[in-house]
Amino acid sequence: MDIVKNEICKLLTKRTVLILLFLLVLNPVLGLYTMNTVNDDGYTGKDYSALYGEISNYSREDVLPEIEQRQMTAEAYGRISLCSRVYKEALACLSYDEYLDSVNEKADEISIMNKFSGNGGFAEKNAAKTSRVYSKLNGTVPEVIDASGLLNITDNELTDYVAVIMLFIIALNLVFYEKSENQLALLRTTARGRRQLMASKSFVMIMAVILITLLLYGINAVISMCFYNPINLKSPLQSVYLYYGSPFKLSIGQFLACYFPVKIISFILLGLFFMLICAALDNIIFVFVASAVTVVIEAICYTTISGTSFLAFLKYINIMYGVRTGRLFSDYVNINLFGYPLNTGVLYGLFWLVCIAVCIFAVTNYLNSVHEKKLLLLPGFACGKNTGCHTSLFLHECYKALVPGKVLLILIAAALFVVWWNPAEKLSYDSVDEVYYKEYMDKYYGPLTAKTNELLDEERVKYDRLSDNIAYDMEQGKSESYINIKYKDELSRQEAFNKLTAHVDYLKTLNEGWLFFEKGYDILTDRTDFKNRDTAQAFVYVILLIAIACGICGADYANHEIRLLRTTRRGRKQHMGIKCILGFLGTVTAFALVYIVRLCNVLSAYGTHGLNAPAASMEHLWRISQNISVGQYILIIMLMRFIGGLLVSLFVFAMFKYLRSGMSVIISCVLFIVLPLALVAFGVTNAQYMLLNPLLIGNIF
């Protein structure tokens, strides 16, 4: 028990407490900001809750006509979209019996089809099992209620990932700090070695998880009670639209009683996993990169893999599936396990039980054994290892960064990742219309002139004749199928031409508009449609920059070599100058790997014909000056990202100078560089303008 008390005291240092309090305060502040900020659909979270409060007094028979009436009389776009959303949710609640009937009907259809085909496989078993599960919900009557308060607690992505960052910081303080200071070496000669100590650290992590969960989600619950309509804990869980397809016959109160134990268990697994990474890796750079890559890969698997994919097990055997706990209750999904439908909730339960046991055993026993670093030399190499000695400070710093600083390994891993992440881009079309649209753009490529307008008018006359011919055939009694087959190519071209003329109408508002096929440039410059790619690139860029900068500076502070330079004639001036040069070269390398490779890949597939055209010719860049070309705009974006990378490297250098600890520097980078980017990924309004985000993302105009 004394060891446990000591470990708790270690967590209560001024630095750790201040960081955790900062994150604890940041969570409700961002939650309140998001609640009062207009979203992309034109309304706020308070507007959504207020509309539910207004319709709560209407009976089940009158609520839909009332919402429909409000939608018809609404004038603002935001109000219309808000009413449309609430109408959809209310309709789903009031027609829940029809939803249950559709589940049974689908099961019957699959059963009949499999009887005729003679194949009683997974599909039939899955349909029958799903029907049996949902038959238990007969008699459930969902209510039209405001679910904002509940979702603020159970479906708050921002809170979930703030908790992940807090667990990472606690794992660093519990395990890596003592390990990096060689304090654990003192315990090798004791009777039980480090086993009892590591068991105590695991117990403290479990206690910290429980406390963090109660604080973070308890604060969210207080916000829900103060700013949203009251939650009726006796209402069926299916009253909440997110949990409309839930197979569990639970009230909202019972759901909350099940939700938090599952949430805590998932966080315990993640916290122990972070502790295992800290125990297994000796370098803070590797700890940071391994933890960041693990969370990113888990999040990518959870969000991008389809539930029907053969890789679906990676979606559901996933720590993030448990961290985003509400999804365990919102859907009923079975995966194919040798022809037997196994529920993903059961699968995840088995997964976390096994993983928690493995992590506790590994964390407790790994550091108990002796791990000595051995220098391996090839035969005959030792005699010649001193040949070619030099006194170049620059080459010495290069060696320290590449080998002790692990930058060489990081660059090799980054290069392999870039090769996998950026396969050869090919010219692709979303539809047949787009093929014809490109043909038109290539045909009329160039400035929009009077001659171009004449050619467009001639083409428009052709489609006017086409409309006359179709009208004539319809008068002759020709069927619609006959007309679609006869004029298939012409109709496809007409859709492309209509899209072209709409774009021409926009170009006429400019002093000098250009016609060119802009899809490749949309990929590089459109922050709306390709926002996720920009954010993902910024994450990779930042992780690589932090790892390289820590490798350049970290070796000197890890072995306290920096103290030896105080008594030299020039102090650290020349030394830091060389490190700045290496930081610049590292930034150039990271920038080339993340952005230049992608740029060359896209331009090689879609061509460079539009680089000289005004950037404003693309409709999403209507704010950009017409004097700036597409090529210049892309250059501006790239320059912003490069400057952002330099600032990240300078930030890491400055943190090393003032904090003198690799662990403290990593925590600072997570708080001030990684976390703001995470807010962009979470969809927090205007987060792209925080700190270094405008420079790192680039596409903010």
Predicted regions: what they are:
Residues T16, G193-R194, N283-F288, G571-R572, ...:
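Membrane-helix interface segments
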Residues M1-L12, L187, H390-L402:
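A short amphipathic helical element positioned immediately N-terminal to and/or at the very start
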Residues A171-L186, T190, R194, A549-L564, ...:
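Transmembrane helix boundary and interhelical loop/hinge segments in multi-pass membrane proteins
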Residues V17, L23-Q71, A107-I110, N114, ...:
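Secretory targeting signals
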Residues V17, G31, S266-F274, V295, ...:
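Alpha-helical transmembrane segments of multi-pass membrane transporters/translocases
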Residues I8-L23, I284-F286, C398-A413, G662-M663:
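Membrane-interface helix starts
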Residues F22-L24, I285-E298, L411-F417, M663-P676:
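Central hydrophobic cores of alpha-helical transmembrane segments
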